Each structure stands twice: as C-alpha cells, then as structure tokens.
C-alpha cells in the first residue's frame, strides 16, 4: 500500500439563522465527529465566527452563523464531509479547500528545526 501524505484543509460552513443556538452547537459537534471518524482527519482548530450579515441573500436568509474548521487528512474520504453538508438542510453554504500556504509554512518550519538540530549536534560533537 502506498503512503499518502497528510494535507491541511480548511472547511467553512454557514448554519441558517433560524436554527437555535443549542442545535447549532450540536451541528458543529456532528461536523467535527464526521471529520474525525468518517474522513479520518485530525482537527487542528475550530473557529466559531458567529452570526454575520451576507453581502447578498442565500436561500432567503440575509445572515448566518459561520464556523471554520482546520484539519489534516489524506483527502481520500473528503467526499464524506461534502455529502454531509449537502444533505443537511440547516447548513446553507459550505466550502472546503486545501491550504497550500499552511502546508508550505509547516514544511519550512520543519526544515529550519532540522537544520538547527544538525548545527547543534555538530557543535556538541566537536567539544569532546
């Protein structure tokens, strides 16, 4: 079996404003559960942005409750999350995309850390 590299994704979804706050919280928890169980991802960060006004109406609503979730997965089961969004009427808009910028930043930090460790170990070895 080939190794598939873990990628960083951002998933933003908007919950209809007529859904009670308690139900919105449960819906966010369900999305997190789907990411962890079905998508086999690891959640890095959940941002509840709250109610925001839209620039234009979406499904006859002028505002909605925004949530952004950053997570890591191999991308093979990402369609499970999209299917959940599609069949959930309380979620009126969603978008999931890969964050190349965050992946690049993480790789750079790893390279710098490895270089610093290499310098540290070579300096430590010459003292003996």
Curated annotation (Swiss-Prot):
Q: Show the Pfam families listed in the entry.
A: Ribosomal_S6
Q: Which domain of life is it from?
A: Bacteria
Entry's Gene Ontology cellular component terms: cytoplasm; ribonucleoprotein complex; ribosome
Task: Answer whether the UniProt record assigns the keyword Nucleotidyltransferase to this protein.
Answer: no
Q: Which InterPro entries match?
A: Ribosomal_bS6, Ribosomal_bS6_sf, Ribosomal_S6_plastid/chlpt, Transl_elong_EF1B/ribsomal_bS6
Keyword list (alphabetical) reads: Ribonucleoprotein, Ribosomal protein, RNA-binding, rRNA-binding
Q: Which GO terms describe its biological process?
A: translation
The molecular function terms in GO held by this entry are: small ribosomal subunit rRNA binding; structural constituent of ribosome
NCBIfam families under this entry? S6
What does this protein do, in the record's words? Binds together with bS18 to 16S ribosomal RNA.
Family the UniProt entry places it in: Belongs to the bacterial ribosomal protein bS6 family.
- Quote the protein name from its UniProt record: Small ribosomal subunit protein bS6
The organism named in the record is Thermotoga sp. (strain RQ2)
């Amino acid at each position: 079996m080939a190794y598939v590299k873990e990628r960083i994704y951002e998933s933003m979804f908007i919950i209809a404003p007529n859904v009670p706050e308690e139900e919105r919280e449960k819906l966010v928890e369900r999305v997190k559960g789907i990411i962890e169980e079905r998508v086999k991802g690891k959640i890095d960060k959940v941002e509840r942005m709250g109610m925001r006004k839209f620039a234009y109406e979406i499904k006859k609503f002028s505002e909605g409750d925004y949530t952004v979730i950053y997570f890591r997965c191999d991308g093979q089961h990402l369609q499970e999350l999209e299917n959940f969004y599609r069949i959930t009427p309380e979620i009126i808009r969603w978008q999931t995309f890969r964050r190349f910028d965050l992946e690049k930043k993480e790789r750079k930090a790893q390279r710098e850390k490895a270089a610093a460790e290499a310098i540290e170990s070579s300096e430590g070895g010459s003292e003996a």
